[in-house]
Amino acid sequence: RKQFEEKWDDIKLFIEYGMLSDEKFYDRAQKFALLKDTDKKYYTLEEYKTLIEANQTDKDKNLIYIYATDAVAQYSYIEIAKSKGYDVLLMDGQLDIHFIGLLEQKLEKSRFVRVDSDIIDNLVRKNDKTEVSLDAAQRNMMTTVFKSQIPTLEKAEFMVMFEALGEQSQPVIITQNEFMRRMKDMSAMQPGMNFYGEMPDSFNLIINTEHPLSKKVIEETEKDCHAEIEPIQKEINELNDAIAKLQEASKGKKDEEIPVTEKEELRNKEKEVDSLRKKESELLTQYANKHKLVRQLVDLALLSNNMLKGEALSQFIKRSVEML
């Protein structure tokens, strides 16, 4: 067995290719094919299932295989997973993305998730997650504040999300959706999937609302911006109520049956809401530009993902020195 493990990295590509291309070969090879984890330990499929099933089975009885594609770049995510008692596979081979898809088809009630595709509590869902104690207005406000401080990255889009992850977790975490990332990886290897390859990378910027630094930003933003933002939000709510009434009044009517004055009134109110939202966004962006901690938290999350480069990295270093 030891000699086989020593040779596995050299023959892995050929074994995986055979398993992917020949059903009968898969049936034979599944008994001796090995999986390698980030601690450089090797397991057969059955051995690995036995290793993880006690701790990596979610609330829906699915067995969750957590994997990394780069042990160095994804080091922080791997360490978080290990701190939970999870084992992380290393799937960095040329055919591993396809091999993962094959195993998901063959292994009953099993899913493969990349270690950086979500927060750790969502990778292996054991119970219902803690609710975030922010209302809709607070979420909208903090979304604008954090999103305004994300530097422009080529072919990358960010969605700001909020999770209650506990005081010990990082204040801001970046994850990438498993499905879209896998589709983009496969598009690089398969003709006819250029659609996914041309799409921008989609990332989640997750704000941990229970971390002291995130709490500080939220509390200070509400305190410092309350006087300017509250009247705008109040006016937006009043306009939205009026818009809802106009839409309800025209519900079920044909376009020609709705009075021109009502159509015009609806358009004007929607324009007013857009204008007020723009004003609110500008005020919050101006505030965030002056609040060094917001940009510092965003940049730290980007840095941990090897996504902070060029001018943004230079500014981060300069800001870090100033804040010491």
Name each model-derived stretch.
Residues R1-L324:
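Conserved GHKL (Bergerat-fold) ATPase module
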